[in-house]
């Protein structure tokens, strides 16, 4: 690695949580499955909806409102609500069901075990530096049991 400027001592360290401290892919897959199961429970008449349908709703919403991509929770919630209305559900009911489905997603999304190696690293770094978590996602540091390391 080449440094073109003198490297000064660190004053703090920031982490993007997803795929840095743990493998996020399987976590999101499980969370999406939990959301699908909740939708099936709450709206059985709709049946099991292809995950590609929800991805298309997200892409459509991002085209209409590119800024929504910066709030992934809102983006997912609004895309589910939009998808449900397109499938024939009334707006009010779609909003309520989307909220409950997103809640299932969020709970499952935060239901993971951060590897011991990440805990050890964070503990050692937190003893020397202020640590900051940066994410555009919706991981809950308390539910992940890593909030004690961050400011």
Model-derived features: positions:
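Hydrophobic (often cysteine-bearing) scaffold residues that line and stabilize catalytic clefts
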Residues: 24, 28, 72, 76, ...
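Residue-level signal for well-ordered alpha-helical scaffold segments within enzymatic catalytic domains
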Residues: 30, 34-37, 82, 86, ...
């Amino acid at each position: 690695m080449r440094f073109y400027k003198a490297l000064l001592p660190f004053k703090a360290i920031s982490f993007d949580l997803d795929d840095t401290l743990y493998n996020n892919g399987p976590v999101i897959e499980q969370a999406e499955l939990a959301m699908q199961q909740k939708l099936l429970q709450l709206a059985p008449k709709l049946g099991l909806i292809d995950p590609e349908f929800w991805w298309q709703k997200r892409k459509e919403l991002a085209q209409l409102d590119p800024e929504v991509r910066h709030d992934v929770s809102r983006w997912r919630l609004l895309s589910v609500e939009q998808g449900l209305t397109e499938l024939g559900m009334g707006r009010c009911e779609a909003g309520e069901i989307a909220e409950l489905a997103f809640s299932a997603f969020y709970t499952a999304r935060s239901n993971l075990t951060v590897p011991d190696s990440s805990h050890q690293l964070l503990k050692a770094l937190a003893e020397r530096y202020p640590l900051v978590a940066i994410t555009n996602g919706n991981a809950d540091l308390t539910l992940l049991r890593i909030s004690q390391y961050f400011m």
